[in-house]
């Protein structure tokens, strides 16, 4: 979140965001307040990509979020996080400050069919990590588009792809660079 604020503060029109907050490592309220702050400072320019991968080993995961039950909680955590961006209801005990009523474009990140189905069910944009799972790209995109349910956040499916791209001064150098990524 710190670098997002720095980049947004030095630009005026581009959208800036996280290409992956691994939600298993963070409490939804904490993420909502951080991104609510950013969206309050830079309205209409902040994106929040949400992933379910731990991104680290078990010891670090426990240190980051000791009570976490596992990736199975991800859909509930996403829904909880999105709730914090809604207008606070009368009597609501826990609120994101700032965050409630703030527009943050949330994306589901994934490299499997699970993420595609979740994004479709929640009516959220989907970013597919084809650099991790290129063979799943077509199937995940098709499932997302077929199962997409319009929501208050998004009326039609929206897919973004993360790709590896290699540019080099010669074919030989390009081949060397490509094979080093495999």
Where are the regions that the model predicts?
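Active-site-adjacent structural elements that line small-molecule/cofactor binding pockets in enzymes
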Residues: 1-182
């Amino acid at each position: 979140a710190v670098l997002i604020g720095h980049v947004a503060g030095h630009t005026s029109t581009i959208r800036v965001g996280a290409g992956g907050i691994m939600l298993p490592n963070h409490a939804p309220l904490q993420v909502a307040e951080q991104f609510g702050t950013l969206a309050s400072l830079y309205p209409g320019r902040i994106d929040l990509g949400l992933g379910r991968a731990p991104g680290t080993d078990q010891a670090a995961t426990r240190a980051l979020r000791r009570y976490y039950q596992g990736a199975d909680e991800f859909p509930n955590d996403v829904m909880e996080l999105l709730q914090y961006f809604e207008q606070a209801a009368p009597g609501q005990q826990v609120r994101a400050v700032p965050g409630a009523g703030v527009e943050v474009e949330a994306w589901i990140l994934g490299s499997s069919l699970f993420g595609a189905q979740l994004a479709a069910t929640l009516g959220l944009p989907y970013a597919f990590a084809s650099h991790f799972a290129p063979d799943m790209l077509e199937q995940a995109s098709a499932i997302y588009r077929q199962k997409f349910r319009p929501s208050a956040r998004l009326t039609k499916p929206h897919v973004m792809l993360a790709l590896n791209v290699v540019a080099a001064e010669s074919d030989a150098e390009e081949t060397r660079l490509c094979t080093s990524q495999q």
